[in-house]
Amino acid sequence: CVFSQYTFSQETVENPEKFTSKNKGKFYIFWGGNRESYSKSDIHFKGADYDFTIYDVTAHDKPKGWHLDYLNPARMTIPQTNLRIGYFITNHYNISIGVDHMKYVMYNDRRVDYSGYYPNAGSYNENPVGDQLTLDEDFLTFEHTDGLNYVNTEISRVDDISSLFKLPNTDKFQINVTEGVGVGLLYPKTNTKLLGKDRYDQFHIAGYGLSAKVGLNFTFFKYFFIQTELKGGYIDMNDIRTTSSKADSAEQHFWFLQRIIAVGGIFKI
């Protein structure tokens, strides 16, 4: 009987519960970078003396590449970045808040269809012919470069798949799969120069976004991780500021696809 009690006690000491076996009550934070792709978009501009739409506009992101700006607090908004803080409400589900700092740059010098009217047509090197014009910089520059800020809340599920790879100790190395959905506001700083007006570049709540994601999480030594995500979503901005006058505005909606890689930590308080 004494031997049995000793054996049981020894097994308890030798096989403590792993930190990675349960997630409920844990906090996490991560910081990383992203690349984006965007669908074509119709952009509607309106003001006191103009009201026109340009169709099937294409755009690209503006990556910084590998750079120390990702680590410089004074310059962290220059690259395309992701910041997220979350809390596990169960072993599998967590809620989080975050900012996806994307960048959106309209391609200039491309021929597009348009409709509507604006003053002094033909004087901005846009060469309007029929229902087409050229997106010359004298006519329009349009960027959400500081940035296309998606401030959002997500609910995500996390599942440990380490057993599929026969990993012996998840407290040393663990692989998780994660998926989630999100909703939030668009708070862009839109850099616009329109019809010869002064450039405008100020933060403004412009609309909303919806998103869904799937990703892989690689956790090392309990507390540190690398996370990769593929996130897609829909953005609808119906109140984009384009000049210092509140009479001037734009609206657009489009789909986006983000590729994210981030580093972070997970802990209990």
Model features per residue range: what roles?
Residues 9-87, 188-190, 258-268:
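Short glycine/proline- and aromatic-enriched beta-strand/turn motifs that initiate or cap beta-hairpins
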Residues 15-17, 68-71, 137-143, 194-203, ...:
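Extracellular loop and loop/strand-boundary signature of outer-membrane beta-barrel proteins
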Residues 18, 22-25, 84-192, 264-267:
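Gram-negative (and chloroplast) outer-membrane scaffold detector with strong preference
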Residues 23-27, 77-81, 145-151, 173-175, ...:
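Residues that define the transmembrane beta-barrel architecture of outer-membrane proteins
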Residues 41-47, 108-114, 167-168, 188-198, ...:
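Outer-membrane beta-barrel translocator domains and adjoining extracellular loop/strand segments
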Residues 41-44, 50-51, 215, 219-269:
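Predominantly the C-terminal beta-signal and adjacent terminal strand-loop region
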Residues 57-66, 128-137, 189-197, 242-245:
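Flexible, solvent-exposed coil segments and beta strand-coil junctions
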Residues 83, 153-155, 210-214, 230, ...:
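Membrane-embedded beta-strands of outer-membrane beta-barrel proteins
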